[in-house]
Regions:
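Bacterial Sec-dependent N-terminal signal peptides
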Residues: 1-22
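Metallo-beta-lactamase
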Residues: 22-26, 30-31, 61-62, 69-70, 119-158, 160-227, ...
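Conserved beta-strand hairpin/beta-sheet module of binuclear metal-dependent hydrolase folds
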Residues: 30-77, 165-178
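Divalent metal-coordination and catalytic microenvironments
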Residues: 34, 56, 66, 81, ...
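Structural recognition of the beta-strand scaffold that forms the well-ordered cores
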Residues: 37-39, 55, 63-65, 90-94, ...
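Active-site metal-binding motif and surrounding structural segment of the metallo-beta-lactamase
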Residues: 59-61, 72-116
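Short, electropositive alpha-helical surface patch
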Residues: 226-242
């Protein structure tokens, strides 16, 4: 009887675990060392689409790049990070003005997290009455938090007029956001604010400045390939031919 009961309970646990996995709204994946990608989801053109953000765990606290696309995951992300690493998020930098990057800025400011965008992003958010960061970055800057240093780099317009990338030169990690398309992407995605003419030049500037990246984190879909810069150029070339 005890064996039957145990088997039944194990079965229920497996079913519950499977249900949680299939309904998951927040996923955290390890990149390397202290670097992690977090993924949330929204519906785009009638399909479920992932949005990738990144965070790095430092001696002083956690630095977050972009905020969740799914607004229900602002707090679960903070909670998940604290449970995993026993550290709080202390800095958040959004890489452009779209909601899949900036939606949580106001929420995170309430918790004393220092939030940043470029001045250009801030002006766009202000004009559209959308969440703004507490601080603005006037030019390409180097941040040092704990044992890690990284650069904010504006290479030019592309997906949006204000998109920046984050470059960790020592670790060779490039966080590209929506400016860099995943190798899974079959088109350029949302072009509402895009500058398709400038975009290839911007990507080439990134290739020249952020050389030989070991990891390239794209804004959406699979981020595990280092060929995403080349793939973005290919998609742009295909778009020009249409």
């Amino acid at each position: 009887m005890r064996n039957i009961t145990l088997f039944f309970l194990l079965g229920i646990c497996c079913i519950t675990s499977f249900a949680q996995e299939t309904n998951q709204r927040l996923k955290i994946s390890h990149v390397c060392g202290d670097f992690y990608v977090y993924i949330t989801y929204q519906s785009y053109n009638g399909q479920k689409m992932s949005a990738n953000g990144m965070y790095v765990v430092t001696n002083e606290g956690v630095v977050l790049f972009d905020t969740p696309w799914d607004t229900t995951q602002f707090q679960p992300l903070l909670d998940s990070i604290y449970v995993r690493h026993h550290k709080k998020v202390i800095v958040c930098i959004a890489t452009h003005s779209h909601e899949d990057r900036t939606a949580g800025l106001s929420y995170y400011k309430k918790f004393g997290i220092k939030t940043y965008t470029t001045k250009q992003t801030d002006e766009i958010c202000k004009d559209r009455n959308e969440p703004q960061a507490q601080y603005t970055i006037d030019k390409d800057s180097v941040f040092t938090v704990g044992q890690y240093s990284f650069q904010t780099y504006y290479a030019g317009a592309g997906h949006t007029p204000d998109n920046i990338v984050i470059w960790f030169p020592k670790e060779k990690i490039l966080y590209g956001g929506c400016l860099i398309k995943s190798i899974e992407a079959t088109d350029l995605g949302n072009l509402t604010d895009a500058n398709v003419e400038a975009w290839p030049i911007t990507i080439k500037h990134i290739q020249q400045t952020c050389k030989n990246p070991r990891y390239i984190i794209t804004g959406h879909q699979d981020w595990t390939s280092t060929k995403s810069l080349e793939h973005t150029l290919k998609l742009l070339e295909e778009y020009k031919k249409k």
